[in-house]
Amino acid sequence: AILRILKEEGCGVDCSSKVELTMAEACGFKGQEIMFSSNDTPEEEYIFARELGGIINLDDFSNIAEVEETLGTLPKTMSLRFNPGGYFKIANTIMDNPEEAKFGMTEAQILKEKGVEHFGIHAFLASNTVSNEYYPVLARQLFQLVVRIKKELGISLDFVNLSGGIGIPYRPEQEPNDILLIGQGVKEVFEEILVPNGLGHIRLCTELGRFMLAPYGALITKVIHFKETYRHYAGVDACAANLMRP
């Protein structure tokens, strides 16, 4: 029901498995409304994603050969997951520590040589940030990469997927994110970096499922077990199968 409402409101879907692709298909999502981001991916899932016309988002350099071998040829539109490397800091707090590999530049060149015509980049560096700075900082890094790809490779990207990461306040002392302020921050970076370089056409995508939905429902559970190790654990009669992203 929720997916159908999102479909009616013009949203797309982010899928990472055959089950999620199947749910997307059942709700009427198709083509570039679907972003397929997966790792350790079975061949049949690449095939299914292509059948639906979804955008396959590559997570690793080795995925290029895997997709080409599985599908026989690379799709005309593909996306690359970018990892900027180093420490990612927001408000003096380390949000994540991506590995050093800067996946994006070399891979874009290879895809171009193999016939891919439309490109996008994607990044997922942090989860459930309660900070208005995260998205604008991430956008700056991705937009700078977009400009480099255009200048050094002659490739003009079609879209940038900022992924998720904007969280909600689970604790009373936490301040909620200001989505209008976040949006304005991304807009300012867009106009500062992309527009002057002739890239104002680029489409921006987000994956804000938690931010959009989590505040409007509740999972009620009962504590059924306690465990004492180096921490105190309370086990409940629910699991990720009941609510994957609370």
Over which residues does each language-model region extend?
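C-terminal active-site-proximal or functional interface alpha/beta core segments in diverse enzymes
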Residues: 127-130, 134-246
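Active-site-proximal beta-alpha core segment in soluble small-molecule metabolic enzymes
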Residues: 1-159, 168, 189, 227
